[in-house]
Structure formats: C-alpha cells, structure tokens
Amino acid sequence: AGVVLKVDGSPVNASVMYQPGGAVNSTYIKRGLTPFGEYMPLRNLAEVVSPYAKSVVDFKAGSELVTHQVAGAALGPIICYEIINDRLVSEMSASSKALIVQTNSATFSGTAESRQQLAITRIRAKEYARSILSVSTIGISAFIDSNGEVVDEIGENVQGYLTGDLLLSDHATNASKWGTLIKIVILSLFALFGLRSFRKDRAV
C-alpha cells in the first residue's frame, strides 16, 4: 500500500506491505523525492518568486533500500518518479526479482502523464529484465513482462482490478552491469563527433 507517514515530525512517502492480519511486514520510504511536489528547492528564493511555494510541505527522504518479501521472493518497491532515477532503479533491480511501481497520478488526470510514465516503466522492465506491476490510484495500472510488453492493464479512471502472474528473474543485463560506463562512452562519442564537426565548420 502507498501511504504518507510521519517520521521525526516530517511526512514521508512510503510503500508498506501488510500481513493478512494487518500487521506491518515491511516499509520502504521513498528515497528520490520529487522537486516542487515533495520538497521545494531553494525555498527562500522560491517563496519570494511565488507565494504558492509556501504551501509545499517538505517531505523527508528515506535512506535505506528495503524490499518486500512475498513467498520468499524479494519484490522491489519504486515510488512514482523514482522510476526515472537510474541509480535508484538499478539498485532496486539488483536487490529484487520483480518490481512494483506505485504512483498517484490524480493531479495529472486527463493528461498524457499516465501513459508517459507507463512507457518509462516498460523501458525499465526491458532494461533490467524485470517483470513490473505498475499500480496507479487512477490508472493506468498494468502487468508488464521482462521484455517491456504490457500483459494486461486498466485504463485511466476505470474502476476495476487486475490479477496475473509476476514472473521472477535474477538475470543481470548489460545495462545493470555496465549502465554507467555505457552512458559515459556514448556521451564521450557524441562529444568527440561534435568537436570534430565544430572544427570542420571553423576550417571552412
């Protein structure tokens, strides 16, 4: 379940796994907070620019990677826009055999945001070879296989539920093993070709 809790007097965005009797089995606190939504960067300046900045409550970020254990398998919780954070997704994928992405898209109802976030989630499934259960308060919710294909989904603002299999995997892809290095090499090549083109243009 996705809940807002209080830790040391500050709100935290959390993924909580409950036992059938209601006791808490495990709690993951969101580590990658969303600027302007969960905290206000440069608050003093922002409040001068816009009085609305004062209404944004600063959440507290978690510091621990926690997985939910289900039938002996580790499922990795990812909360909302953590899905775009390479480091957080990589760490969670390496520590789990499937992922659960939880999000509240109510603010963006009727826009392309839900479909965009689902597309990003599908890329992550393929990138790390992990099946993903994507759960949204208003949709789109979906089962996504490890190839990034949507197995089943519920559309936005549609009442219903999904049942399905979340296949487990501990396969390490090249992206998970060499992701950072690959990005550095690609960026370096782009920079090299860009520099060569710049020199050619100046030579002409």
Short names for language-model regions:
Residues 1-178:
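Soluble catalytic domains of enzymes that build or remodel membrane lipids, polysaccharides, and related
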Residues 203-204:
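Cytoplasmic C-terminal tails of single-pass
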Residues 177-200:
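Selective detector of the "anchor" transmembrane alpha-helix that sits immediately C-terminal
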